[in-house]
UniProtKB/Swiss-Prot annotation:
One of its GO terms (molecular function) is DNA helicase activity. One of its GO terms (biological process) is gibberellic acid mediated signaling pathway. The gene is SUV3. Its cofactor is Mg(2+); Mn(2+). Its EC number is 3.6.4.13. Homodimer; in free form. Component of the mitochondrial degradosome (mtEXO) complex which is a heteropentamer containing 2 copies of SUPV3L1 and 3 copies of PNPT1. It comes from the Eukaryota. Residues 72-213 form the Helicase ATP-binding domain. This is ATP-dependent RNA helicase SUV3, mitochondrial. It catalyses: ATP + H2O = ADP + phosphate + H(+). ATP binds at G85, P86, T87, N88, S89, G90, K91, T92. Belongs to the helicase family. SUPFAM superfamilies: P-loop containing nucleoside triphosphate hydrolases. It holds the Pfam family Suv3_C_1.
Length: 579
């Protein structure tokens, strides 16, 4: 019974809110007697899985029937409604109206920005709604609704209504498994699933063995999207409401400077490594008709999660570096970005789209006329309990070799693929050097570390090392509050963005190992200061003197836009530093 006791102790130690619930989708398991040298778990999922085999032992690497992993959902005959259509078609709006009208429910989105937006919408409609993301918890007394990032969705709570947004992300190599888990596992009478029509055949196949009733509702775009026959031409043709899209930090700031040098426009910027709060603030200033920031320069981060009043999308290029090589944008990527132009009920109801380079126009026009390629497979990833049992069967707590072996042996149906674990394996190699248990290693491997960012990676290593040595990690041992300053160059800006990632990592860990990472409030306040300083840099960088002077008529604007308590902390630290 040693395995049983260990699993139960671990499970008691970590509550549902302390970690993403999908870590323990097998948390309802009952431990049975153990015979011989192998430990068998009499979990409903594994019990059902055994029914698919005639052998006398379980095959933990058999992932061919993932719908049986969620017995609570299988006890229901769910009514599943697929709301599918292009950007700006109203598909998500209709699903959210049903969520508002339900007695209990959950919204599962791909981004914190979307989760926060939905929580605010429901609370404004007098429907108390919690916000739960990897880095945030805002719980409302008496709330029966929650808005969560998809990884945080709870498979054990029963809801009247659940909504999954951007379901086409089941095909994402890195995060698709979280959407698959929500699709198969949410225990809800009604499940409303929103996304691209390209995912419909796959969803229908996946849900067929569940017994759920599936209804598909197709939507058309509410406002026209017009692909232009000519390129932008000169940058002097930039006009208010334009969004120039490019795919690297360097080119974003280069284009921003070039546009502002014309003396007619000031630019907001949005890209992935900006803090979410900064992205929201930049989008708000772009949307504000009283602001002089009437042009947006952005990456594909605008594809989802931000409400933007864009009149025209201008692609500076139709190629991007995907972490491995430069490649052409896919049809789905082009349509997702282009679709942000024009917004029903906004100042720009008709959207336009063009390019800087005339050689790119044929690809742009072809992509907009084409249906998105059908999504063939959905992502899967084993839960911690499965990997824990697998490691015990092989007599090792080294996570990297266990994960590699499991992935090599995993058996899948044609509708699924195993999630891309390249980054996870790199983190596993780091934490395997430390005296940590398997669960802790697994947790660090799931953490939001940017393994391609040196500062972010060093932060993870220090957090893990201090945790392994002392069991408690004080933020001040790694990071000195009061040392942050407004960046003076792009390199310093990038460094500040990386520091923000490290602080976010600390907050993430503090929600899962609360006693060991006790400085959540300090990390959160420093995170807010990072965002403030980045925004101050964006206000200073590249603006023409007259335009900047014109815009900053209210010198206290920055002060007014931040929570007063955060500002007090910030300026107290500045005072201490000056002494």
């Amino acid at each position: 019974m040693a395995v049983a006791a260990a699993l139960l102790r671990r499970r008691a130690l970590y509550s549902a809110l302390a970690s993403p619930s999908w870590l323990h989708d097998t948390s309802s398991c009952y431990i049975c007697s153990i015979s011989g040298t192998h430990s068998l778990v009499n979990h409903p999922n594994l019990r059902l899985q055994r029914g698919y085999h005639n052998s006398g032992k379980f095959d933990l690497t058999d992932l061919t029937h993932p719908h049986i992993w969620y017995p609570n959902a299988r006890e229901k005959k769910r009514n599943v409604f697929l709301h599918v259509g292009p950007t700006n078609s109203g598909k998500t709006h209709n699903a959210l109206k049903r969520l508002e009208a339900s007695s209990s429910g959950v919204y599962c989105g791909p981004l914190r920005l979307l989760a926060r937006e939905v929580a605010q919408r429901l609370n404004k409609a007098n429907v108390p709604c919690n916000l739960i993301t990897g880095q945030e918890r805002e719980e409302i007394e008496g709330a029966k609704h929650s808005s969560v990032t998809v990884e945080m969705a709870d498979m054990t709570t029963e809801y009247q209504c659940a909504v999954i947004d951007e379901i086409q992300m089941v095909g994402c190599r890195s995060r698709g498994f979280s959407f698959t888990r929500a699709l198969l596992g949410l225990c809800s009478d009604e499940l409303h699933v929103c996304g691209d029509p390209a995912v419909v055949p796959l969803i229908q196949r996946i849900l067929e063995p569940t017994g759920d009733v599936v209804t598909v509702q197709y939507y058309e775009r509410l406002s026209p999207l017009v692909p232009l026959k000519t390129t932008l031409g000169s940058f002097s043709n930039i006009k208010a409401g334009d969004c120039v899209v490019t795919f690297s930090r360097r080119s974003i700031y280069m284009l921003k400077r070039r546009i502002e040098m014309g003396g007619k426009h000031l630019c907001s910027v949005v890209y992935g490594s900006l803090p979410p709060e900064t992205r929201t603030k930049q989008a708000t200033m772009f949307n504000d008709q009283d602001s002089n920031l009437n042009v947006l320069v952005a990456s594909d981060a605008i594809g989802m999660g931000l409400n933007l009043n864009i009149s025209r999308i201008i692609f500076s290029t139709l190629e991007k570096f995907d972490g491995i090589c430069n490649r052409e944008l896919t049809v789905a990527e082009i349509k997702q970005i282009a679709g942000r132009a024009g917004r029903y009920g906004s100042k720009f109801p008709v959207g336009e789209v063009t390019c800087l380079n005339s050689d790119h126009l044929p690809l742009l026009h072809s992509a907009l006329k084409s249906p998105s390629p059908i999504i063939e497979r959905a992502g899967l990833f084993p839960t911690f309990d499965v990997l824990s049992l697998y490691s015990r069967l092989h007599g090792t707590d080294f996570f990297q070799p266990i994960l590699e072996r499991f992935l090599d042996k995993a058996k899948l149906s044609p509708d699924y693929f195993i999630a891309d674990c390249e980054d996870m394996l790199k983190v596993a190699a780091i934490v395997d050097e430390l005296p940590l248990g398997l669960y802790d290693k697994y947790l660090f491997c799931l953490s939001p570390v940017d393994i391609r960012d040196d500062i972010s990676t060093k932060g993870l290593i220090q957090f893990a090392e201090n945790y392994a040595k002392k069991g408690i990690v004080r933020l001040k041992e790694i990071f000195t509050p009061g040392t942050l300053q407004v960046p003076k160059s792009h390199n310093q800006l990038k460094e500040l963005e990386s520091i923000h990632k490290v602080l976010e990592l600390y907050v993430w860990l503090s929600f899962r190992l609360e006693d060991s990472y006790p400085d959540r409030e300090l990390a959160a306040s420093q995170k807010s200061i990072c965002s403030m300083l980045i925004e101050e840099y964006l206000e200073r960088s590249g603006w023409q003197q007259n335009g900047r002077k014109d815009f900053l008529q209210k010198p206290k604007r920055l002060h007014q836009e931040y929570d007063a308590s955060q500002l007090r902390k910030y300026f107290q630290e500045i005072d201490v530093r000056s002494k």
